[in-house]
Amino acid sequence: FLNQLFIDLSKLFNMLIAIIAHDGKKAEMVQFLNENADILHKNEIELISTGTTGQKVKKAGFKVTALLTGPLGGDAQIAAKVADGTCNMVIFFRDPLEKHPHEPDISMLMRLCDVHDIPLATNPSSAALLLKGYYLQ
């Protein structure tokens, strides 16, 4: 059971985590990253993000590669990295109470995570379980 729950050990090196947060969740994302900075800084983890999330995360002192903003295709860029196997985990703090014009891209990203068996966390509790569970191995 645990083997199915955690990511394959072969992905330990060159870990690429995508981080995305809707506008109403960006502060929560920065707080989450700060709370887990020891894990993120201690391990071989590379962060990528959508554009505006990346700006906020960089201001908080994290090294991140920012892609396009979500509405301009950033979610689709991350989805492509999920599909080609270069992205190992997605942390996406969605705002389920707001409408988003790029909802089809969001749905595509989530679907591709399921298709390619990539862990996807959509809130701080599930993201903490993924990160901490991964590094307990």
Residue ranges and their predicted role:
Residues G74-M110:
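Mid-chain, well-packed structural core segment of small domains
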Residues N14-I17:
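Extreme N-terminal starter segment of soluble prokaryotic enzymes
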